[in-house]
Amino acid sequence: MKALWAVLLVTLLAGCLAEGEPEVTDQLEWQSSQPWEQALNRFWDYLRWVQTLSDQVQEELQSSQVTQELTVLMEDTMTEVKAYKKELEEQLGPVAEETRARLAKEVQAAQARLGADMEDLRNRLGQYRNEVHTMLGQSTEEIRARLSTHLRKMRKRLMRDAEDLQKRLAVYKAGAREGAERGVSALRERLGPLVEQGRQRTANLGAGAAQPLRDRAQAFGDRIRGRLEEVGNQARDRLEEVREHMEEVRSKMEEQTQQIRLQAEIFQARLKGWFEPIVEDMHRQWANLMEKIQASVATNPIISTPMPQENQ
């Protein structure tokens, strides 16, 4: 909280010094680190170009192009300021409601002054365009001189507004940072005793309940060990039964295989006994038939009959 009041005091002193000095430097005295500052610098550069009142500036002033460009730059700046303010509001955290309201009111006032002066500048440029249009064919030097003077004054006002807004936002940011740090400290203070109580309770429970837990773990381990041994014995017995059964099956299969082999040999011998006489008898009959054919051919040779010749 001391840091916040220190920033407020510096801001007030800076404001007093600013009121005592009518002249303002031509450049904004900060680094454009935030988007709203970058948008304001773009507006500032364009205004510096308008203030030259060159022939191109006067031509664009008469065509309303300058006021349109300024409108876009104004809207961009105000949009970025609102976005940055909203971001800081989300970071304020547990800051007192009174402090939050006061800081928000100060930033809102500075923001409103900057927006109003920007609007005044745009209206003055529109008024200049209307005055020039009503004086067609006449000298407009006096109008340009008045506009130049007004632009210098408006530039100083806008610069003061911008610097004041930047300082108010800096205070707002400091309040957000302090609120966050204070919130963390308060949370640490609230949770510290609870954490210590929990640690002490855990230590007490560990000291008092360690032995019962060990006894229960030992008993549980013994039960598990006994159950595992029982299951192992049952598995071994079952495996032995399966092995004996498989041995019995193998013996039966070998016996049946031997019986089938013997039966096949007997059947083969029977088939051989059945078919061998038949085959031998067929061989004899075939041999006799061949002998008869050969004898018949030898005794009755075939006489070749001459082929009839064709008429010549």
From Swiss-Prot:
Q: Where is this region: Specificity for association with VLDL?
A: 270-282
List the residue ranges of the region (Lipid-binding and lipoprotein association).
202-282
Q: Where is this region: LDL and other lipoprotein receptors binding?
A: 150-160
Q: Where in the cell is it found?
A: Secreted; Secreted, Extracellular space; Secreted, Extracellular space, Extracellular matrix; Extracellular vesicle
Its GO CC terms? chylomicron remnant; endoplasmic reticulum; extracellular exosome; extracellular matrix; glutamatergic synapse; Golgi apparatus; high-density lipoprotein particle; intermediate-density lipoprotein particle
The signal peptide stretch is 1-18
Q: Which GO terms describe its molecular function?
A: amyloid-beta binding; antioxidant activity; cholesterol transfer activity; enzyme binding; heparan sulfate proteoglycan binding; heparin binding; lipoprotein particle binding; low-density lipoprotein particle receptor binding
The record's Gene Ontology biological-process terms are:
AMPA glutamate receptor clustering; amyloid precursor protein metabolic process; artery morphogenesis; cellular response to lipoprotein particle stimulus; cholesterol catabolic process; cholesterol efflux; cholesterol homeostasis; chylomicron remnant clearance
Where Phosphoserine occurs along the chain? Answer: 139
From the UniProt entry, list the residue stretches annotated as the region Homooligomerization.
258-312
| Pfam families associated with the record | Apolipoprotein
Residue ranges of sequence repeats: 72-93, 94-115, 116-137, 138-159, 160-181, 182-203, 204-225, 226-247
Question: What does its PTM field state?
Answer: APOE exists as multiple glycosylated and sialylated glycoforms within cells and in plasma. The extent of glycosylation and sialylation are tissue and context specific.
Which residues are annotated with the PTM Methionine sulfoxide? 135
- Main localization is secreted
Q: Which UniProt keywords apply?
A: Chylomicron, Endosome, Extracellular matrix, Glycoprotein, HDL, Heparin-binding, Lipid transport, Lipid-binding, Oxidation, Phosphoprotein, Repeat, Secreted, Signal, Transport, VLDL
Q: Phosphoprotein among the record's keywords?
A: yes
Region 8 X 22 AA approximate tandem repeats: start and end of each range?
A: 72-247
Which Gene3D superfamilies does the annotation name?
Apolipoprotein (1.20.120.20)
- The superkingdom listed in its UniProt entry is Eukaryota
Sites binding heparin sit at 154-157, 221-228
Assembly and oligomerization? Homotetramer. May interact with ABCA1; functionally associated with ABCA1 in the biogenesis of HDLs. May interact with APP/A4 amyloid-beta peptide; the interaction is extremely stable in vitro but its physiological significance is unclear. May interact with MAPT. May interact with MAP2. In the cerebrospinal fluid, interacts with secreted SORL1. Interacts with PMEL; this allows the loading of PMEL luminal fragment on ILVs to induce fibril nucleation.
Similarity comment: family membership? Belongs to the apolipoprotein A1/A4/E family.
Protein's job: APOE is an apolipoprotein, a protein associating with lipid particles, that mainly functions in lipoprotein-mediated lipid transport between organs via the plasma and interstitial fluids. APOE is a core component of plasma lipoproteins and is involved in their production, conversion and clearance. Apolipoproteins are amphipathic molecules that interact both with lipids of the lipoprotein particle core and the aqueous environment of the plasma.
- The protein here is known as Apolipoprotein E
Upper taxonomic lineage: Eukaryota, Metazoa, Chordata, Craniata, Vertebrata
Q: Its gene? A: Apoe
